[in-house]
Amino acid sequence: AQCDEYFSSALTSMEKEEDKKQLPSDWPPIVAGKQALYSGLAQYHQSKLCSEKNAVAEEMARLEYAKTLLTAGIERGTGGLRNVKEWLQRTEQALIKARKDNDFIYHERIPEKQSLAAIEKSPVAKPTPLTARLGNPDAPGLFELLVTP
């Protein structure tokens, strides 16, 4: 969920006029695709937690939302991410299984995606402004601190 938020803020930053000039024109669609893909993967993994808790209705809602997001991500461009179609197939198979379980056993009403609880976020990185690196020719290289002199 945090990765989705980072890509969303990166996309918002890329749409600013001062940043648009410094970036290749194909970057925003790729970032938009990745944002949708990571959001879809977060929903897929959250659906697995719902499955473990026997919350079939929420599981189905999250899987349907994940399918929508993964499909949108594929349409926008995967940006070099592999196995995206495989994740979409896994999502579709899990959705079929959850629907069968719900139809035969639980008979629960599927909640709307807007009513789903937000997925907890875990910060894993610190965002850097685009212009801090791209706009300053004197800025240290991206990997300069990782390489010993």
Question: Across the structure, where does each feature detected by a protein language model lie?
Answer:
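Amphipathic alpha-helical interface segments within eukaryotic helical scaffold
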Residues: 1-8
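Eukaryotic intrinsically disordered, low-complexity segments enriched for acidic and Ser/Thr/Pro residues
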Residues: 2, 15-149
